[in-house]
A protein has these predicted regions:
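Inward-facing hydrophobic residues that define packing positions of alpha-helical scaffold repeats
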Residues: 108-111, 190, 197, 242, ...
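Hydrophobic-face positions in mid-chain alpha helices that act as interaction patches
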Residues: 237-376, 408-415
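Sec-dependent bacterial lipoprotein signal peptides
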Residues: 1-22
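Membrane-proximal, proline-rich intrinsically disordered regions
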Residues: 22-68, 307, 312-313, 319
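Short coil/linker segments at helix-helix boundaries
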Residues: 152-192, 240
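Conserved, well-structured interaction surfaces
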Residues: 81-153, 184, 201-204, 363-370, ...
């Protein structure tokens, strides 16, 4: 009987020891990378504060840059039909509105987590790296909300934006299941974007990355500010930040169209030309995004979406081959023209990159790289701001600088 009692005591002791060991095991984070407790982890986390699902394909199909060239071109799908017709999307893919919404809010969540983590590490005063990381986080949060409010709401205007429905502005990491958020209004969203933008501008730097153009840096922040304030109808601010971005010699900052003019534009050579266009060493590229995207295929020498295209009619009557205020001179970077199995007039801009998930089976995802912010856009934003302010001479100076950089014309525009 005594032996049996000792056996029970020993069994209970071992069981309690096991439970204690189990508790210790469960109290330990299985992957310490999940705890953002160092500068390096904060900086790594900010890599996910940029959306990997682009809005540019839908935006291009929604625009006047794409036309319906008829059923003789069979390259289409329900997705392309829907976005061209501005119809309700009934399916989801990497560039659907559902993915855009989710991906940009996911990027915002990462930015918010980085902001919380930096505060837990002592704040931006702790080190230059954390200070610049905080600036990047604020800018990422501002940029993602800016894209969302312009994709899903009416454009800002002083007359109606205080009553136009906005989007939820997320400033903290999510901590509850299925919470309810208020959309607010567009004016409120813009005010919050400006608040984050100003904070980010004061802190952002260029020192945390070996290739800073895949992250917000000083020049990219200035270019974003110029774009934002153009939409916000604060035109003096556009000029202020465009000046900071472009410097005293804007011509040295613009895209190298003389170099692009020497590169081949036929379909076999599409890839090197597009890769040069998004090269981080090019001065014009201020912020580069990578994305799961068919842009390089839908706007390339492929039959994808061939029913809807930028073709000969648009080129000759509306844009790159039509008469312009400076005449009908040619662009230095001549477009590729296809008029057989598809009707396309294309400038090589987005590379077609295939990411294999199974090289043996030959399956994976199409991806691309694109300039989210560039000096050429910044210059045109400044020109538009000058127009709004009635300074037509300065506007023409900027427009002439842009035209002579990309076009062979000798003519100047005057007020």
């Amino acid at each position: 009987m005594k032996t049996l009692k000792i056996t029970y005591i020993l069994a209970a002791t071992f069981a309690l020891a096991g439970l204690s060991a189990c508790n210790k095991f469960l109290d330990t984070t299985p992957d310490n990378r999940a705890t953002v407790d160092s500068e390096e982890k904060v900086i790594s986390l900010l890599g996910s504060a940029y959306s990997e699902n682009d809005h540019i394909l839908i935006a291009e199909f929604y625009s006047d840059n794409v036309d319906n060239y008829g059923i003789q071109y069979t390259g289409t799908s329900r997705f392309f039909d829907s976005i061209y017709e501005w119809s309700e999307l009934e399916e989801s893919n990497n560039e659907s509105t559902e993915r855009i919404w989710g991906s940009y809010y996911s990027a915002i969540a990462s930015a918010n987590q980085a902001i919380i983590a930096i505060d837990g590490l002592g704040g931006p005063e702790t080190s230059t790296a954390l200070s610049q990381a905080l600036g990047e986080a604020y800018l990422c949060r501002a940029y993602s909300h800016f894209i969302l409010v312009n994709m899903f709401c009416l454009q800002y205007n002083k007359q109606t934006s205080s009553t136009d429905l906005g989007i939820p502005y997320m400033t903290k990491p999510e901590t509850t299941l299925a919470p309810h958020y208020e959309r607010g209004n567009v004016a409120d969203v813009y005010a919050q974007i400006e608040e984050d933008l100003v904070k980010g501008l004061a802190l952002v730097g260029d020192d945390n990355y070996t290739v800073p153009k895949y992250h917000f840096n000083k020049l990219a922040a200035y270019a974003f500010a110029a774009r934002f304030y153009l939409f916000y109808e604060k035109y003096d601010e556009v000029i202020k930040y465009a000046d900071l971005c472009l410097g005293s010699s804007p011509s040295t900052m613009l895209r190298d169209y003389d170099v692009l003019a020497t590169m081949p534009n036929g379909s076999p050579q599409q890839q090197p030309t597009t890769l040069h266009y998004v090269d981080p060493s090019v001065n014009a590229n201020l912020l580069l995004f990578t994305a799961f995207s068919v842009m390089g295929q839908a706007f390339g020498a492929y039959s994808t979406a061939s029913m809807y295209s930028h073709g000969a009619y648009l080129a000759k009557n509306e844009d790159c081959q039509a008469n312009q205020p400076w005449g009908n001179s040619a662009y230095k970077d001549a477009p590729a023209v296809y008029n057989g199995s598809m009707d396309r007039v294309i400038f090589w801009r987005c590379p077609r990159i295939f990411q294999y998930t199974d090289p043996v089976a030959g399956i994976g995802f199409l991806r691309t790289v694109y300039p989210a912010l560039s000096t050429d856009e910044c210059l045109l934003n400044r020109a538009e701001a000058y127009v709004h302010l009635g300074d037509y001479n300065k506007a023409c100076e900027d427009l002439n600088l842009w035209v002579h950089n990309c076009n062979t014309t000798k003519a100047d525009m005057t007020p």
